[in-house]
Amino acid sequence: MFCKEEEPYEFPENTFGTNELLPNYQQNCTDGEAISDTKSDLAYLEVEITDAHEESNTDKPFTCTECGKTFTRKPNYESHIRAHKGEKPFSCMVCDKAFAWKSNLLVHYSVHSGEKPFSCTECDKTFSNKAQLEKHLRVHTGEKPYSCEQCGKSFAHKCVLDSHQRTHTGDKPFSCTECGKKFSQRGNLHKHLKTHKLDQPHLCAECGKTFSFKSTLLEHQKIHSEIRPLSEFGKTFSDAHNLLKHQSTFTEEQKPFPCTECGEIFSNEHELLTHQSTHTEEQKPFPCTKCWGIFSNEHELRTHQSTHTEGQKSLPSTESGGTFSNEHELLTHQSTHTEEQKHLPCTECGGTFTNEQELLAHQSTHTEEQKPLPCTECGEIFSDEHELLTHQSTHTSPSTEFGVQTTEDNHQSPSKDHTGEKPFSCSECGKSFFYKSVLKDHLVVHTGKKPYHCIECGRSYTHQSSLKSHQRTHTGVKAFSCNLCDKLSIISKLRLHYRVHSGEKPYPCTECDKTFTKKEQLESHYKVHTGEKPYPCQQCGKSFSHKSVLKLHLRTHTGDKPFSCTECGKTFTRKPNYESHLTTHTGKKPFSCTECGKEFAWKRNLEAHYKMHTGEKPFTCTECGKTFTWKSNLRSHYTTVHGISPIQYACTEEDVNVIKTEEGDSFSYMVTLEN
């Protein structure tokens, strides 16, 4: 839309099945004032979309030969056919954009008018059309009408369901134009593109903006091809860039890109993608090279790095005289002085790094479908193959400072990591390797020999390095310390510990997309999906998924309440309940919502409140399948809809089962815990 001094554009009568006009676009830019509509009192075109399913009791004589869908009314059938043919007969008279349905065109016109007449009564956000408002309301109601047929998970919006279903189908429609890697989510592709640390050689001759990729430049140049003469609209500008900057001050309310999670609307796709990252726990592509911290955007990273002040630097470099905060930072710096600098390549994007710490921090940005790789010798787990290969070399010969083997075999094919070639194959199991030395190391697995024995407990190991690592469990020596919090451990546990600081969770659940720091956590979590309950109660026969839950359950038989309040003498079975109770005496509300700032005295209340923002509905009615955000709503539903009046809901667990038992012509119900 351009700033234009002319008569209001009047759409031909009955163009859209109405005699009303769209809000006109008479605007004055000569003084740089904000745009204002001259006929704001005109009625807004509210779009009412009729659902053909309302006439569910009538016949549907119109059948689509392409997909078999049936329709009651011929106009709906004809509109549907256009979706298959790709026809778009309804064009916008302002920007020439075309649509298959008239209703979509009417919705689109609100982009040009800037009006948002539909307000949310819960949070005062406004929207251009009724459909956007209805989608947004699901944030408050928690409604999730779109269910995945594969796993039963529900979603508030169809586009989110479509995105989720790709995790089942494996479809990856978004490809990187630089390296060909494919992704199931557009957001992951955008994050991946940032890993191509390239210069920006592609210059826009119109505005001087530079781009890393030619394709991005070509896409950008389209905005210049639609620019009218710079002096046409009154105010003049020296170049197109300044005109675009000027026009942006008048289009602040025209934001056609809605967030499907919270309903907020943005001016362009980049702003939308940046915002959507705040809703996820996904990868954070900006690692701090000083302390393993990883951040969502460059601004957060720079703010964090300012905490590494000059006053905290006490370790001097013998080469340059510079001082550093910790040993990790000093070693990273010193590696830049050596002539035999080790370039460790990233197998995902080809980037090279000075040391293993930098490489590990970088590789945490490649979280798309990471698969844990175990070392066959000692069981240590790694997140990528290059890291595993580097580790395996420590089982065969002395390693360099960075743990990279320097035998002649390992220098035969320096480009193998980039080509993916694995020329050395095991004749026993067919497994292939990059290096001959790693193959030799692997062959020991098939011999079964374990010549290294622990004199303390008699345990045997294939390699001496594994034995030394094991012996530290007897001596108490912890040779490796975390340079962030001074915790000590063996190297394998130290790597696990670093994930506390980096936030890396390389073990994904294939059932529900949750991720975990440790393999043991993932295995424990799987019991939720399998229903395995290996810990039975000897008193009542009830079984539990985890031993800790069984211990808590046993207190219901013994009556043990070990946690006592010193203020009022009240006792509690569980420590979290005791700690929550203490806040009733202090009046403190230590739990605050990061979304709206509301404070709560108890964590469970905060967690329940969060569901209002996330739309989560974990409580399901076993009678009709309806889901609810809060347990109290489920109880009310059982009573008012199904006539069920449970005697008590005394449990403090998250989930509730209502078991229906048939007794002749009647039914009885029993409320139980879901472990």
Swiss-Prot record:
Residues 304-325, 390-407 have a biased composition (Polar residues). Transmembrane segments: none annotated. Residues 408-421 have a biased composition (Basic and acidic residues). A zinc finger (C2H2-type) spans 62-84, 90-112, 118-140, 146-168, 174-196, 202-224, 257-279, 286-308, 344-366, 373-395, 424-446, 452-474, 480-501, 507-529, 535-557, 563-585, 591-613, 619-642. Keywords: DNA-binding, Metal-binding, Nucleus, Repeat, Transcription, Transcription regulation, Zinc, Zinc-finger. Residues 302-325, 390-423 are annotated as: Disordered. The keyword Protein transport does not apply. Pfam families: zf-C2H2. One of its GO terms (biological process) is regulation of DNA-templated transcription. May be involved in transcriptional regulation. This is Gastrula zinc finger protein xFG20-1.
